[in-house]
């Protein structure tokens, strides 16, 4: 499978765009992405939107694209979804069609220079192809979206640890998220140790006190 491949199903009707929402960057119609992966992608897309002039990445999955080409269907999804800033047209759609055993990505005009045909084909091959052949769609989607996001950050001169943001280890501005539960548990352990030491000191003092 390559990003530039064009598949068609002549006997099938044109597939309609389904499941998209202006409040979500995930449309998992094929039900192939885990909740953790959806959260990972959403976190990255939100960070892009906040730090890269409204840029967004959307992941759209389906079984088949009907008698559309992959390129044509991805463009329809892109137009219907309206990802990215309207004035900069800096959205990106990753289309994954499992029944057709193919994938495609379409950038908005504002990102076309950064994602030329060869660049985008190489990016998809390097980050999605190996996982795709194993039907490990979660890993493929994560790696591909991360690679896209890092390139978009380069376009806007933004330095963010997108993997940490996607994983929830950093917020959308890149600040490390403290694990309050671990801090709470650590404080409780420290308190217990101090109490144990104090009690031990008191017991030793009592034992050393001369009998009257």
Residues of each region from the PLM?
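C-terminal segment of classical bacterial N-terminal signal peptides
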Residues: 2-12
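Short hydrophobic helical membrane-anchoring segments positioned at the boundary
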Residues: 211-212
């Amino acid at each position: 499978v390559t990003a530039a491949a064009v598949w068609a199903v002549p006997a099938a009707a044109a597939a309609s765009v389904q499941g998209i929402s202006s409040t979500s960057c995930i449309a998992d119609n094929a039900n192939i992405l885990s909740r953790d992966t959806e959260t990972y992608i959403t976190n990255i897309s939100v960070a892009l939107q906040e730090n890269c002039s409204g840029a967004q990445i959307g992941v759209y999955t389906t079984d088949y694209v009907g008698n559309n080409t992959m390129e044509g269907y991805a463009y329809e999804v892109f137009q219907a979804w309206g990802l990215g800033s309207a004035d900069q047209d800096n959205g990106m759609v990753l289309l994954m069609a499992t029944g057709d055993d193919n994938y495609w990505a379409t950038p908005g005009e504002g990102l076309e220079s950064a994602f030329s045909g060869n660049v985008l084909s190489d990016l998809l091959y390097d980050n999605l192809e190996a996982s795709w052949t194993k039907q490990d769609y979660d890993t493929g989607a994560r790696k591909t979206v991360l690679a896209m996001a890092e390139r978009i950050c380069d376009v806007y001169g933004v330095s963010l640890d997108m993997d940490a943001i996607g994983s929830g280890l950093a917020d959308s501005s890149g600040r490390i998220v403290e694990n309050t539960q671990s801090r709470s548990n650590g404080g409780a352990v420290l308190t217990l140790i101090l109490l144990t030491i104090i009690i031990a000191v008191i017991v030793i003092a009592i034992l050393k006190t001369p009998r009257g």
